[in-house]
Amino acid sequence: MSLEERVKEIIAEQLGVEKEKITPEAKFVEDLGADSLDVVELIMAFEEEFGIEIPDEDAEKIQTVGDVINYLKEKVGG
């Protein structure tokens, strides 16, 4: 499973949205219906899945699915 697929899987599971709606441009809050707690839980799920720590200042910059994919590629490769 590619990094992108793993990210989509986590988002679909955490937010209960269909994978078809999870595009790189999709914003967690506006497009996928996440609230601030959902976003925190997503960040924690990404940290656990990929074995990294995402500092708060980085987490605040992650607004879209593409943002998190690019961030994770930078940190873990993929």
Curated annotation (Swiss-Prot):
SMART domains: PKS_PP (SM00823). Transmembrane segments: none annotated. Gene3D superfamilies: ACP-like (1.10.1200.10). Its main location: cytoplasm. GO terms for biological process: lipid A biosynthetic process. 4'-phosphopantetheine is transferred from CoA to a specific serine of apo-ACP by AcpS. This modification is essential for activity because fatty acids are bound in thioester linkage to the sulfhydryl of the prosthetic group. Residues 1-76 form the Carrier domain. The keyword Metal-binding does not apply. One of its GO terms (cellular component) is membrane. Keywords: Cytoplasm, Fatty acid biosynthesis, Fatty acid metabolism, Lipid biosynthesis, Lipid metabolism, Phosphopantetheine, Phosphoprotein. The keyword Membrane does not apply. One of its GO terms (molecular function) is acyl binding. PROSITE patterns: CARRIER (PS50075), PHOSPHOPANTETHEINE (PS00012). It comes from the Bacteria. The modification O-(pantetheine 4'-phosphoryl)serine is found at S36. Belongs to the acyl carrier protein (ACP) family. Carrier of the growing fatty acid chain in fatty acid biosynthesis. This is Acyl carrier protein. The lineage of its organism: Bacteria, Pseudomonadati, Aquificota, Aquificia, Aquificales.
